[in-house]
Amino acid sequence: VVSAPHGQTLGGGLEVCLHSDRTVAAGETYMGLVEVGVGLIPAGGGTKEMARRLVSPPLHAAPDTPPLPFLQKAFEQIALAKTATSALEAREMGFLTENDRIVMNADHIISAAKREALDLADGYTPPEHANKVYAAGRNTRAALEMGIKTMQWGHYASEYDGVIAGHVARVLTGGSLSLPQWVPEEHLLKLEKQAFLDLLKQEKTHERIEALLETGKPKRN
């Protein structure tokens, strides 16, 4: 599967790209996981992918490395709905890999994506999902949650922003795990689904969804 995004590539659209074999992005591609704006978290594998792409590699390379700085980056990108201003920045944020291509002229991305698909098809085998994802556990989650409280005390985040961000922190760190460990991708995917369904039951999430549909702007409640 080769994805060929251009322009706004947000939420589920980005999650399609994250799980493609290759992405061929236009230079002016604006990527972001912005689900918190409607009171939800990325639950199409987006939260899991941020842990897999931003946290797992440095911990594989140096197991004794403190995970918090890498988790902080993944957490902030989701909880603050950060959006890349270009495909180059999307690569810096982990939305694109070094193997993904950036095509500066958007008129050429379909032909470039077709070439990539044909190249990949020669001898293609589906990717294996044997690799595990680093889950930092409860202690590191507590540090992220303290950051959430600090944002609330400074009036940079509402009470419900904190609820949503808490779900993000829980998924990224592996849920109720007491100790850091490597877990299957499915572990984080189940946590994503659980958080998404829990938030979908909340009235304030409904208010955020309705506001975006009616006004085109996110509601802070």
What residue spans do the PLM features occupy?
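Catalytic binding pocket for nucleotide-activated donors in carbohydrate/polymer assembly enzymes
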Residues: 32-34, 45-48, 52, 94
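Intrinsically disordered, low-complexity segments enriched in small/flexible residues
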Residues: 57-82, 86, 92, 98, ...
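An acidic, glycine-rich surface segment that forms the CoA-thioester-binding/catalytic face
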Residues: 1-6, 46-71
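Conserved P-loop NTPase nucleotide-binding/switch module
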Residues: 41
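Glycine-rich phosphate-binding loop at the start of an alpha helix
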Residues: 11, 44, 84
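Glycine-rich beta-to-alpha active-site loop
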Residues: 1-38
